[in-house]
């Protein structure tokens, strides 16, 4: 199942409530402010702080 990019208009980072960006190659949503990545499983973003992974722009 593909991620619906329209969700980006309504979802926010659960930590800072900031904007998330879609990383299609890695199937995750990125919060650049908190440097966290949230996985997308079967088209559904897992927006739980304890499930986030550190994000590195170079990765």
UniProtKB/Swiss-Prot annotation:
InterPro entries the UniProt entry points to: Trm112-like
Domain of life: Bacteria
GO cellular component labels: cytosol
Family: Belongs to the UPF0434 family.
HAMAP family, sorted: UPF0434
PANTHER family noted in UniProt: PROTEIN PREY, MITOCHONDRIAL, ZGC:162634
Annotated protein name in UniProt: UPF0434 protein Shew_1640
